[in-house]
């Protein structure tokens, strides 16, 4: 539900990089309708068959996803508005980082033209998403923001806002002093 509320902030030409929990037909169809590109890890329940579709390379092809049955949470009007099929690129990526073991990731993306993005570029997108998560984790731990102390949703928003203000104040002081973070 949170993703659906945030979709309105995405503009045509933006690229959404997300994890496998968001890789559903309805999400991808809505992103395509908005003109938003995407790179997502494939959901573990969806098995990819690289022998079908238009082959772009080894473990890299363009596939057609058929519209699944309507989920219980979706309104019939929204389901009827979805296209009958969507065209996606399915790629097996090797995400390699120094000091870490290489991870093999099956990704789904909207970049279906082979010259548009290479598998290495798609892998780079996904790795940057992972680094952002690690950076947020570092910030939360170093500033003692890793545990939220309030339970009310409105107060949680205020607490998160206070943490972000404190973080930005520390960063601005670092910039003013000329110190390297």
Describe every region a protein language model picked out.
Residues 1-181:
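Single, function-defining residue in the core of a domain
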């Amino acid at each position: 539900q949170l993703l659906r509320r945030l979709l309105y902030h995405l503009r045509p030409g933006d690229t959404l990089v997300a994890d496998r929990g968001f890789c559903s037909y309805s999400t991808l169809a809505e992103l395509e309708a908005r003109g938003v590109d995407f790179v997502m890890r494939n959901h573990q329940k969806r098995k990819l068959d690289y022998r079908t579709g238009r082959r772009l390379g080894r473990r890299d092809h363009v596939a057609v996803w058929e519209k699944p049955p309507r989920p219980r949470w979706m309104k019939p009007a929204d389901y009827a508005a979805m296209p009958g099929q969507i065209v996606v690129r399915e790629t097996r990526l090797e995400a390699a980082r120094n000091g870490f073991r290489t991870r093999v990731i099956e990704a789904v993306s909207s970049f279906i033209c082979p010259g548009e993005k290479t598998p290495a570029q798609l892998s780079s997108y996904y790795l940057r998403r992972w680094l952002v998560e690690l950076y947020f984790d570092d910030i939360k731990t170093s500033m003692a923001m890793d545990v939220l102390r309030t339970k009310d949703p409105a107060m949680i928003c205020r607490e998160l806002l206070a943490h972000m203000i404190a973080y930005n104040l520390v960063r601005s002081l670092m910039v003013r002093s000329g110190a390297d973070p």
